[in-house]
Every structure is written in C-alpha cells, then in structure tokens.
C-alpha cells in the first residue's frame, strides 16, 4: 500500500498491523477489561485486542526511546560533572477532532506509567490553552475555535519551556467541555514527571512569525517524540457526527452544558447541525492546519473505518 499524500517512502517505514503486532515481543499486558472501559472515548472501538496489537508494541518502542534519552542524559551528566537537571520526556499526540487522539493519549499514559523506569506520566491537553470565550468573542473567533489562532500560543510555549527548564511545578490551565470554556482560576499542576504527554489538534504545526526579525519558537522544539492519529476524512466525519448524536443524548442534557439548546433537536436536525459544523469548522481545520502536519510526526497510526488501527508508519532515524 502506498504511503499517504505528502509522506515520502524514503522517510517512513510502513508496517501492516500484523507486522506491528509482532513487535510487541514479550511485553506484558498490565491492563484489564475494566481498565480499558475507563479509557475508551465516546463512540470509539477499543478492546483488549487493540491494546495488545497496537498499543503494547508502541509502549515498548516508547520505553526504548525514553531509556535511550535517559542514558544520554546520564552521559551528559558525567561529561558536565553532574551539573544538569533531568527533565521530562515529552510525547506529542496530534490529529483531528473525533479521530481518537485523546483515547490514544489515555492508553499510552496508562501503559507507560506501569514501566518501572518512568512511573510518573502526566497527560495535558492543549484545550486549556485556548483563549477564553470572552476573548474569542471579542476577536470574532468563536467560529474558529480549534484553529491555530484560537490558542494562546505564547502561554503554551512558556509552559513547555518551563517544563524543559526543570521547574519544580508548572501549571496548565484547565478546560471544561461541559461549559465549552477555560475554567477561571483552575490549573493542572505538573510536578517534574518522567514523561509528559501533550495532546491536541495543532501541536505539530509550525509556528507563525512573531514579527519579521526572527523565527518563532516551534512547539516541536520541545518534543522528544510525536504521534499523529490518522484516518480518511470521510471516516472521521462520520465518527464526529455519531459522537455528536451520542452527546446530544447525554452531556448536552446537563443544565450546565453550553450546548443544552441542542438537546431538544430531533434526530434529523441534529445530524444536519453536526454535518454543518464539520463542513464549516472541523473539516476545513483538518484540511488546512492539521493534516498538513502529519509528515512531521515520528509515528503515524492509520485507522480504518471501524476505528481500529490498520497500519503504523514509523519515521526512519
């Protein structure tokens, strides 16, 4: 099977699921069915087979990568006479709305923290770095929420820089999907983890210029490994609509929900609205800003129509 548009065969090793599964070797499965139930995203397929076939080999690869980074750090410590501080290994996970990147992040967190060499694994989403709704409204960006310009990029860069500088505590803002806004006064405090997983739509995007005198800092400057969760656009669109319909029957009915008004729509109206949101916001964002970053990832998980990973593409060293 040919690589996707924009991916050079010279850059990536392309593995079918069976070949990837064999790379698990003797890696044990530390999760039970009930653990996986708590990690599954709304409307997503996730079972023990998916964890064993896809995510155990990935956790093994990441453990090797982290171990190599730790050995390099130890060598640098010896070279410098013990004058540098160990810093978190940062894994970025990118992909479209509804593609399953949040589930991927939660699974990897659960697996990686069970490896003895790096038990402290934190997960942070970039949702908290969205500008608050009042700022987005003032800038006429509410319909561009999720696009690069809707994020406080400077705050996100500062967060990552402080982590890599070895700060004892670094705070990330908290986002509520229920109220569809950043929560004032709340923060997720990250305290020198062994690994930090950063999950978000546009984490692999190249930074815009902050003026004409010097290039901006890229988020990827801080990443040790990056993953792109991929699927065909028509599948992601269908998953998004199905997720919207499930949310309409559950979370949207909460009186605190920003989308409470949508809970009263009939089935056809809900589908029409979800299709409209995809066509006007999520689809263009995927095409213009998210999918073009795929080639920057170290590893790509390609899903089939059933949400199962069919192929894995690993960038050559």
From Swiss-Prot:
Major localisation: cytoplasm
Keyword Cytoplasm among UniProt keywords: yes
Biological processes per GO annotation: coenzyme A biosynthetic process
Enzyme class: transferase
Coiled-coil regions listed: none
Record localization: Cytoplasm
Pathway, per record: Cofactor biosynthesis; coenzyme A biosynthesis; CoA from (R)-pantothenate: step 1/5
This enzyme's EC code(s): 2.7.1.33
Gene3D superfamilies: P-loop containing nucleotide triphosphate hydrolases
SUPFAM superfamilies: P-loop containing nucleoside triphosphate hydrolases
Keyword Manganese: no
Recorded catalytic activity of this chain's protein: (R)-pantothenate + ATP = (R)-4'-phosphopantothenate + ADP + H(+)
Residues holding ATP: 95-102
GO molecular function annotation: ATP binding; pantothenate kinase activity
Keywords: ATP-binding, Coenzyme A biosynthesis, Cytoplasm, Kinase, Nucleotide-binding, Transferase
Pfam families assigned to the protein according to its UniProt record, in alphabetical order: PRK
GO cellular component, one term: cytoplasm
Superkingdom of origin: Bacteria
NCBIfam families linked: panK_bact
Protein family: Belongs to the prokaryotic pantothenate kinase family.
Protein name in UniProt: Pantothenate kinase
């Amino acid at each position: 099977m040919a690589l996707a548009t924009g991916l050079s065969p010279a850059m990536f090793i392309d593995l079918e699921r069976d070949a990837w599964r064999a790379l698990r070797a003797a890696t044990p499965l530390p999760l039970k069915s009930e653990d996986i139930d708590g990690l599954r995203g709304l409307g997503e397929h996730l079972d023990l087979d998916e964890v064993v076939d896809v995510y155990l080999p990935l956790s093994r690869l990441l453990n090797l990568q982290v171990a190599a980074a730790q050995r390099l750090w130890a060598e640098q410590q010896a070279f410098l006479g013990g004058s540098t501080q160990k810093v978190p290994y940062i894994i970025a996970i990118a992909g479209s709305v509804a593609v399953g990147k949040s589930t991927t992040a939660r699974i990897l967190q659960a697996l990686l923290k069970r490896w003895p060499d790096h038990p402290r694994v934190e997960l942070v989403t970039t949702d908290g770095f969205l500008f608050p709704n009042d700022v987005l409204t003032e800038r006429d960006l509410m319909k561009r929420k999720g696009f690069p310009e809707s994020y406080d990029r400077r705050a996100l860069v500062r967060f990552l820089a402080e982590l890599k500088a070895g700060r004892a505590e670094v705070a990330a803002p908290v986002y509520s999907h229920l109220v569809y806004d950043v929560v004032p006064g709340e923060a997720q405090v990250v305290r020198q983890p062994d690994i930090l997983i950063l999950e978000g739509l546009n984490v692999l995007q190249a930074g815009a210029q902050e003026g004409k005198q010097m290039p901006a800092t890229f988020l990827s400057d801080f990443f040790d490994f990056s993953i792109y969760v991929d699927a065909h656009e028509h599948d992601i669109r269908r998953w998004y609509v199905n997720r919207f319909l499930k949310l309409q029957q559950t979370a949207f009915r909460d009186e605190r929900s920003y989308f409470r008004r949508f809970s009263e729509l009939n089935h056809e109206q809900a589908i029409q609205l979800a299709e409209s949101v995809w066509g006007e916001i999520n689809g263009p964002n995927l095409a213009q800003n998210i999918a073009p970053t795929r080639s920057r990832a170290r590893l790509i998980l390609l899903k089939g129509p059933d949400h199962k990973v069919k192929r894995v593409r690993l960038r050559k060293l």
